[in-house]
From Swiss-Prot:
GO terms for biological process: organ boundary specification between lateral organs and the meristem; xylem development. Expressed in roots, stems, leaves and flowers. Expressed in vascular tissues of hypocotyls, leaves, roots, developing floral organs and siliques. Residues 16-118 form the LOB domain. The gene is LBD30. Pfam families: LOB. This is LOB domain-containing protein 30. It comes from Arabidopsis thaliana. InterPro entries: LOB (IPR004883). Residues 188-228 are annotated as: Disordered. Involved in the positive regulation of tracheary element (TE) differentiation. Involved in a positive feedback loop that maintains or promotes NAC030/VND7 expression that regulates TE differentiation-related genes.
Length: 228
């Protein structure tokens, strides 16, 4: 099949007939509709399939209705359909179209899978939480001396002991009663200094002064103390 040619050169006067006329065993006249598209060498085999499927007269009428600049594409389509029909008499070129459509669907599925996989690779992965380097370094070098010192609470003990000490101090500041008030002789005159010390301790811890005896009863008080 030839996509170009000069009809006059394929006519009976200038050379051999075109492939279509050669197959039909007729004289190729000037202006043959098949001469530009079916050469004398390989055109006869291609035109044989076209003639068997569509018929030479039908193809001639079809090409006359097609614009001249679109005739080469029309001849290619006619030849392809004729050869497909010879290979598959039932479906013809439809089987080839279905096969191509299945390939398209398969390729689209593969493309979608690859695009989804590529999208997952482009998404930023969440970073695991990491301890700052400065914090980790300080934790590793941490020692007892680095721990914050907690100062113990300062308790004012004076508030606890002040009442007791003040009362003791007040009692100590009170003038001691002399020994002659109780009719007790001095330690130099008495050998029992322990009784006097016990009496003094009782007076200090008791916090009360014994009633002073009247001048008339000094002897009785002294006698009571001596009995004790």
């Amino acid at each position: 099949m030839s996509s170009s040619g000069n009809p006059s050169s394929s006519s009976g006067g200038g050379g051999g007939p075109c492939g279509a006329c050669k197959f039909l065993r007729r004289k190729c006249v000037a202006g043959c509709i098949f001469a530009p598209y079916f050469d004398s060498e390989q055109g006869a085999a291609h035109f044989a399939a076209v003639h068997k499927v569509f018929g030479a007269s039908n193809v001639s009428k079809l090409l006359h209705h097609v614009p001249e600049h679109k005739r080469p594409d029309a001849v290619v389509s006619i030849c392809f359909e004729a050869q497909a029909r010879l290979r598959d008499p039932i479906y013809g070129c439809v089987s080839h179209i279905v096969s191509l459509q299945q390939q398209v669907v398969s390729l689209q599925t593969e493309l979608s899978y690859l695009q989804a996989h590529l999208a997952t690779l482009e998404l930023p992965q969440p970073q695991p939480p990491q301890v700052p380097v400065s914090s980790s370094g300080s934790l590793q070098a941490l020692s007892i001396t680095d721990l914050p010192t907690i100062s113990p609470s300062v308790y004012d003990l004076s508030s606890i002991f002040e009442p007791v000490m003040s009362s003791t101090w007040a009692m100590q500041q009170q003038p001691r009663p002399s020994d002659h008030l109780f009719g007790v002789p001095s330690s130099s005159n008495m050998g029992g200094g322990g009784e006097l010390q016990a009496l003094a301790r009782e007076f200090i811890h008791g916090g009360q002064m014994p009633a002073q005896p009247s001048p008339g009863t000094s002897g009785s008080a002294s006698s009571v103390i001596k009995r004790e």
